[in-house]
């Protein structure tokens, strides 16, 4: 079984020790820091192939995100930007150790999809959707956490719906105010919205918000998720995470 979360837990433990003894992911990198910094091109690392694998999956998500925002005023987010503005900042923020969890969650979210996607080859069409729902929900929690803990604008609200209605936040994200639903969303709402998805960052954020408030309240939906729906939601939620980093984690 590909237990990515446990594997990265030990990578992070190594990074903790290396930084304690003087390592710096940029100025004095070590094999452990190369992985969390997604530096698959770097030499002198025993996990080079795994690092390259992780980097490739994040680059795939960046490519998707770039297509969503190519016709907007949003500044492009490159892999180097991601390393500098998010990963390096989080690794070196010793007064905010919780940010490290965002980095490891970010990496595991993007690399886990390929493993989960292979499950569909077993053709269990009416069985459990737990692996897919929990994977997507982790991405939703990451999306929410990136907004709550961003270093540029501290949100006043404690809920994702409230945050996505704060004028300063939506202005920085360059999106419209997110609308909820009085009786709450159900899984079919997400699938319907995804079918009408216009490949805009506005709708990507809306769908991610809906997924957060649906998968976060129940796993026992009668509707199963299919392979194409899983792939689409994985990319949409990932793009939403990258958008928050692009707009709310740049310090300049």
What function would you assign to each model-found segment?
Residues 1, 6-14, 26-29:
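Extended amphipathic alpha-helical coiled-coil/heptad-repeat regions
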Residues 9, 30-132:
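Charged alpha-helical initiation segments
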Residues 11-25, 68, 72:
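Alpha-helical junction/boundary sensor with strong preference for TPR arrays
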Residues 93, 97-100, 126-137, 195-206, ...:
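Short, solvent-exposed segments of well-ordered alpha helices
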Residues 100-114, 126-158, 238:
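Short, hydrophobic, well-ordered secondary-structure elements
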Residues 147-203, 218:
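Flexible secondary-structure boundary motifs
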Residues 191-252:
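Charge-enriched, short contiguous segments at helix-coil
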């Amino acid at each position: 079984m590909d237990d990515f979360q446990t594997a990265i837990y030990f990578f992070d433990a190594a990074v903790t020790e290396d930084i304690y003894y003087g390592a710096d992911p940029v100025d004095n990198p070590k094999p452990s820091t190369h992985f969390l910094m997604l530096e698959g091109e770097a030499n002198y690392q025993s996990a080079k192939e795994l690092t390259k694998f992780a980097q490739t999956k994040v680059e795939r998500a960046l490519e998707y995100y770039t297509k969503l925002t190519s016709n907007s005023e949003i500044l492009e987010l490159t892999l180097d930007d991601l390393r500098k503005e998010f990963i390096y900042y989080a690794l070196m923020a010793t007064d905010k150790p919780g940010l490290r969890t965002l980095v490891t969650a970010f990496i595991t979210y993007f690399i886990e999809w390929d493993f989960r996607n292979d499950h569909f080859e077993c053709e269990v069409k009416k069985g459990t959707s737990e692996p897919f729902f929990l994977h997507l929900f982790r991405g939703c929690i990451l999306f929410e956490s990136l907004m709550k803990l961003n270093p540029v604008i501290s949100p006043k609200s404690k809920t994702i719906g409230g945050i996505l209605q704060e004028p300063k936040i939506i202005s920085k994200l360059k999106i419209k105010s997110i609308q909820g639903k009085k009786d709450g969303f159900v899984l079919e709402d997400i699938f319907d919205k995804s079918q009408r998805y216009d490949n805009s960052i506005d709708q990507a954020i809306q769908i991610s918000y809906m997924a957060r408030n649906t998968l976060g309240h129940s796993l026992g939906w009668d509707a199963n998720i299919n392979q194409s729906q899983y792939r689409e939601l994985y990319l949409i939620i990932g793009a939403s995470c990258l958008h928050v980093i692009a707009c709310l984690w740049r310090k300049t």
